Regions:
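A short beta-turn/loop motif at secondary-structure boundaries
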Residues: 38-43, 66, 133-134
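A conserved beta-turn-beta hairpin within the catalytic core of GNAT-like acetyltransferases
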Residues: 64-74, 84, 134-139
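Conserved acetyl-CoA-binding loop of GNAT-fold acetyltransferases
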Residues: 121-130
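C-terminal "cap" of GNAT-fold acetyltransferases
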Residues: 114, 133-147
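Conserved acetyl-CoA-binding loop-helix of GNAT-fold acetyltransferases
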Residues: 79, 85-98
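Conserved beta-strand in the GNAT
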Residues: 49, 55-65, 71-78
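Short amphipathic alpha-helix that is part of the acyltransferase structural core
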Residues: 1-47, 51-56
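Conserved GNAT acetyl-CoA-binding A-motif
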Residues: 93, 100-113
């Protein structure tokens, strides 16, 4: 999987469309979640994309402290349905964690869907115990120390 790390201003129209289509396919259609994915936060995010043969198969967005949460954070973690079960989710998350480390951040926070608890725990995140509904889906706050 080829990984790219891009600021919003670096997107081509085609690449942006591909990412938004993937997010919509998973977060709106697959999860039957009729909430707005476009949240005006993409412009501040660092976008981490994994592609195979030019097709985006995995994606996250990274925020520096204060842009979303008080701490650095990762969100919108998504793997194309046709490419699941091949560790691309783990790989794109590890790239995102490594990016945070290279930027000198001491910790990460995520808003994780509860059913993915083991996935994030295996990566080194710890649940804080704060569970809540976000867009009608059970989520929990999870953190990771980077130093």
């Amino acid at each position: 999987m080829k990984v790219e790390i891009l600021e919003f201003k670096e997107f081509t129209a085609h690449k942006l469309y591909e990412i938004l289509r993937l997010r919509s396919e998973v977060f709106v259609v697959e999860q039957d979640c009729v909430y707005q994915d476009l949240d005006n936060k993409d412009q501040k995010a660092i976008h981490i994309l994994g592609s195979i043969k030019g097709v985006v198969v995995a994606y996250t967005r990274f925020f520096k402290p204060g842009d979303y949460f008080e701490n650095a954070s990762i969100g919108r973690v998504v793997v194309h349905p046709k490419y699941r079960g091949k560790d691309y989710g783990k790989e794109i998350m590890q790239e995102s964690i490594d990016y945070a480390r290279t930027k000198g951040h001491s910790s990460l926070i995520i808003s994780a869907q509860c059913y993915l608890d083991k996935f994030y725990t295996d990566l080194g995140f710890t649940a804080t115990g704060k569970e809540y509904l976000e867009d009608g889906i059970p989520h929990q706050e999870m953190v990771m120390r980077l130093n």
